[in-house]
Amino acid sequence: MASQTLVSPSPLSSPSLLRTSFSGVSVKLAPQFSTLATSNFKPLTVVAAAKKAVAVLKGQSRVEGSSTLHQDERQQQLMFVSLAYTQGFMVFTYMSMVIPQMGVSQQDHILIQQVDTWCSEDEIRHAGDLGNIVANAEGVAECRQSWQIRYHSLRPNSVVGRALVVHELQDDLGKGGHELSLSTGNAGGRLACGVVGLTPV
């Protein structure tokens, strides 16, 4: 849809002629239409905001599932993860939250401050480290946990647009003594991932 702006001198030099803002184009209006009304723009008011996000987790492996995130009134997030294996099962997997680019650098992780612990139960930790999840005999892993990361897309610790990643090995929580313990938790390769996006409540 296009729009034109009508402009005129004040007072009108000719009561029957107004010109548009486009050069070389003019429109003629009858005298009874020569008085134009204006209105002020009003700021947009947001009356509701989504407080639910979803990430569908898939990859080159046989691991797939979904993660649903809810934001409560205290601005914490409750995450529900459900993962399934089409064959076999895995006892431990490790989940982290990273930016969408699927690189292997530990710099991908959300780092609110530089710390060397990965346990999701530790008071001071990497904000994107979600710890280990356990699959049952049917190969299904489910977990529920909460942590203080916001949905607000303009904040540096927002989950929107970031990715949830399932790794192939048990995370040693930065305490395993391996050369990769403090960077990736020595959690191995990435089995599945999905980008977090907002969804209607």
From Swiss-Prot:
UniProt keyword terms in alphabetical order: Antioxidant, Chloroplast, Copper, Disulfide bond, Metal-binding, Oxidoreductase, Plastid, Transit peptide, Zinc
Annotated transit peptide: 1-47
Superkingdom of the source species: Eukaryota
Catalytic activity: 2 superoxide + 2 H(+) = H2O2 + O2
Recorded GO MF terms: copper ion binding; superoxide dismutase activity
PANTHER family on file: SUPEROXIDE DISMUTASE CU-ZN -RELATED (PTHR10003)
Protein name: Superoxide dismutase [Cu-Zn], chloroplastic
Organism of this sequence: Populus tremuloides (Quaking aspen)
Lineage: Eukaryota, Viridiplantae, Streptophyta, Embryophyta, Tracheophyta
Gene of this entry: SODCP
